[in-house]
């Protein structure tokens, strides 16, 4: 069983490395980070779809059955995701592109998935955490691509930022709090699984503080720009440069 899991994880790691290499070859005029973020975007979309199917259709429901035995589909998805996180953590360390908080998030994710696979249980809630963690990932990558291509300061950029902040706050913090509560009050999950859940939620709050600061600064900047435009229009009208009909 352990050998089979290791083979799945190694195949997943090889697949993500191959995809990254392919993106690098197809985008030779772009940076390595461009290709890595394409891989991250691909994993985000794929993991959202798979984890949503597991949570909402295949089951079991994470809010009522935390600590339940892993299903075969959960195991496959966790192995697929574990390979990705190993790839991305290695890439971030090699290129020194991320700070301690993101490295801590990746490390906790890797340890949490390994723990669920080794125990043969708690894949239900780990899959739910995967869904909550990745649901904002495509938006985060879109934001980076918009900035790189010079289209961030536009209506599209504002929509992406709004959806990112709204989803992060509502799903990762709001729904995440309810999931953590269900995990803590349930007698089924192991105590160290609960500790891991608390650690992941604490990391989410650290991200949330930074995101709220960003959202506040951007809102103030937008407000001041709007006020400035209105004052200019009023001044022009007052000076008679704008015709009124």
UniProtKB/Swiss-Prot annotation:
* Recorded topology in the membrane: Multi-pass membrane protein
Q: Which UniProt keywords apply?
A: Membrane, Transmembrane, Transmembrane helix
**PROSITE patterns assigned:** TLC (PS50922)
Main location (coarse class): membrane
Tell me the superkingdom of the source. Answer: Eukaryota
Q: Which residues cross the membrane?
A: 1-21, 38-58, 75-95, 99-119, 162-182, 191-211
The record's annotation in InterPro entries points to: TLC-dom (IPR006634), TLCD5 (IPR042512)
List GO terms (cellular component aspect).
membrane
Ranges in a coiled coil: none
Q: Does the keyword Chloroplast apply?
A: no
Name where it's found.
Membrane
Q: Which residues form the TLC domain?
A: 29-204
Cross-referenced PANTHER family, in alphabetical order? TLC DOMAIN-CONTAINING PROTEIN 5, TRANSMEMBRANE PROTEIN 136
Family label = Belongs to the TLCD5 family.
Entry protein name: TLC domain-containing protein 5
Which species is listed as the source? Answer: Mus musculus
